[in-house]
Amino acid sequence: MIAVCAAKFVGYVCKKMGRQGVTWAGKVAIKICPDILEQLSSQVQKAIFATCGTNGKTTTNNMLCAALEAEGQKVICNHTGSNMLNGVVAAFVLASKWNGKIDADYACIEADEASTRHIFPRIKPDYMLLTNLFRDQLDRYGEIDITMNILEEMMRKVPKMQIIVNGDDALSAYLAMDSGNPYVTYGISKPVIKSAANEIREGRFCKRCGEKLEYRFYHYSQLGDYYCPKCGFARPKPDFDAEDVKVGDQLSFCVEGKHIVANYKGFYNVYNILACLLYTSDAADEE
């Protein structure tokens, strides 16, 4: 396949020159063969995972890839965080053979939220993880509602895609619950750390009726146990619920009767690990 050969050559040259050649390889490939991503991604044998959200994308995506590889699975992954169209194309191209053939059980793809418009219709993910939606997005897209509208549209365009969502984030949970797609949730049902009163909170108002949300408690930012006093929209009961969470030099918690200990710091990594566990559990149930 000419597109694959040309892209691999570009990637090799850029690497030799000490430059990051990943996105250039993808750009060349899609210029020569506009449907190359469809051709390559369709060869993934078991499932394609797509990870989106303001925070935790790269960590969770790489964590999932490592977990699958530890089980002996062959995985395509955009490890470097090149999460726009060219970077995703490059991940598939560089994982393929010179003839365009791919031998992979899974693909773990981190996707920029705005770029899902160009990525999802091509790869049609089997699973989509939505980690959270924070103010970060406002710097690039103007309004967080724009990001939500894009993701909502992509959920409709891939109706069989199962959504794995952080139920502690009202914005993310709203998207999943109103999407019509199958979805599962993860969360932390008891307060663990003290949340600052002056933190910026994006999900202050109910996306269904506009009423100000009430919170039984916050974890941090807008993550917590929320409910709408007017229409009844509320945090869903998590399918995967982290209990007995301890934060220190290591993280530890219990989920589904298992005690998890991880060499990570930072409370937010409990969410990343939970998402990864739910990803792999859900995929295993489908096999």
What are these regions (language model features)?
Residues 279-287:
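Single conserved hydrophobic/aromatic residue that forms the stacking wall/gate
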Residues 201, 264-275:
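Short glycine/threonine-rich catalytic loop with a Thr-x-Gly-x-Asp
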Residues 2-187, 195-205, 278-279:
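Phosphate-binding loop of NTP-binding sites
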Residues 191-248:
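Cys/His-rich short segments
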